[in-house]
Amino acid sequence: MSYSVLEALRKSPEEVRKVLLARRVDASLVDKFLALDAKWRQLKKEIDELRHLYNQLSREGAKAPPERRREISEKARELAAKLEKVEEEVKELERQREELLYSFPNLIHESVPVCPEGVDSVPVRHWGTVKVSNAALQSLDPGVEYVVVEKEPVGHADMAEVVLQMADTLKAGEVAGSRFYYLFDDLVWLDFALAMYAMDQLAQKGFRPVIPPYMLKFDIIRRVLDFDTFKDAIYKIEGEDLYLIATAEHGIAAYLYKRELLEEELPQLYVGWSPCFRKEAGAGNRDLKGIFRVHIFHKVEQFVFSLPEESWKWHEEITRNTEELIRGLGLPYRVVNICAHDLGAPAAKKYDIEVWYPAQAKYRELASCSNVTDWQSYRLGIRVTRKGMKKEYVHTLNCTGLATTRTITAILENFQRDDGVVEIPKALRPYLEPIKAAPKEYIYPRRIKQQPPS
């Protein structure tokens, strides 16, 4: 089976046009591709005819009398020159066609919503009881369980920097720029514990722990993401053919670059830990305070290489895995189905898992889970040999395990007390227990005496 987008363009171009319109992408790409592809097919046919004629002349020349051989040889040379010229044209057309094919987003699953302007996702399910003030009750989704709080919660930025005094974005801004931070004391241990918790829980489910390269060559990075869209969002190393990864997904996807797999080698499950480097160029002035949206953070990532027929099962599975991690922390959340226009080019379907932030009175994204089908594997040349020696592109999937700094912000807003003390989720305590200097049950503001609460 060929690449699904290429196959759809040839067999049902109108369906691809509908996908592009749903994604709010220029649908004229279809016509440009079909024109190139038609010319390519025409020239391929011409090459076959020229080769046939050339072979015919060669056979004829071998049997011809000496007086005709020179004439036949001259015709053969002319044909060979023409063949070489057409083959060069085909190579150039293939380059142009491949470049154009790279600009196509993935096809979309039938369950992906096509949404009106101003709507980016559709809620699928909710979990947990949210803390909300009377003034914010109207902002809740229908059917969400809630408890009304009298005191307005403190936002995560003020909790970290003012109440706990364990983060400093002002000094980081002075020495590094906006969206950088210093993290201190118990929040450092919390960062480590969150990563260990996610890595451990997922490894127990059969995911292989991996720390991928933190930098990738241009030829690889352009294959794992939509480079034209994200080239201004990722960091390039000056003077080097290297880019800093925005997520462990990129390095893990590249691990099987140009691999031919057997059916029994799939699925392959990985849980990666890495720092993530992002320019956040499109964020503007959003979330400038605190550590919610920053240039570098640590993240645990699930990644799956799957047989094509099993990828939708795995999409639900990895989403449930992350839900279990968030439920284990006791954070109220919802799962939303992302609208077609907001999917991003690689994903055929994407769920976001959004956690409730009491001080903001809204859900904020904590994790994304995507089925990328064969969009990455086509670019990376990762195929599986099926029975009968048929080759297909594998499917790849990715899902956030936990992004540590963002999860810290959710913990600070959801588990704060009136006296500024923050309760540590019970699921994290086993990962803090072996570390003598780490907090065990509570994080106390630096200004108060650290005595267990009554």
Curated annotation (Swiss-Prot):
In which pathway is this protein known to take part?
Answer: Aminoacyl-tRNA biosynthesis; selenocysteinyl-tRNA(Sec) biosynthesis; L-seryl-tRNA(Sec) from L-serine and tRNA(Sec): step 1/1
Which residues make up the binding site for L-serine?
T247, A248, E249, E301, T400
Subcellular localization(s) per the UniProt record: Cytoplasm
Q: Which Pfam families match?
A: Seryl_tRNA_N (PF02403), tRNA-synt_2b (PF00587)
Q: Name one GO cellular component term.
A: cytoplasm
Q: Does the keyword section mention Protein biosynthesis?
A: yes
Keywords attached to this Swiss-Prot or TrEMBL record, sorted alphabetically, are: Aminoacyl-tRNA synthetase, ATP-binding, Cytoplasm, Ligase, Nucleotide-binding, Protein biosynthesis
Superkingdom as given in the UniProt entry = Archaea
A GO biological process of this protein is: selenocysteine biosynthetic process
Summarize subunit and interaction data from the UniProt record for this chain.
Homodimer. The tRNA molecule binds across the dimer.
The domain-related comment in the record is: Consists of two distinct domains, a catalytic core and a N-terminal extension that is involved in tRNA binding.
Known function: Catalyzes the attachment of serine to tRNA(Ser). Is also able to aminoacylate tRNA(Sec) with serine, to form the misacylated tRNA L-seryl-tRNA(Sec), which will be further converted into selenocysteinyl-tRNA(Sec).
Which protein are we looking at?
Serine--tRNA ligase
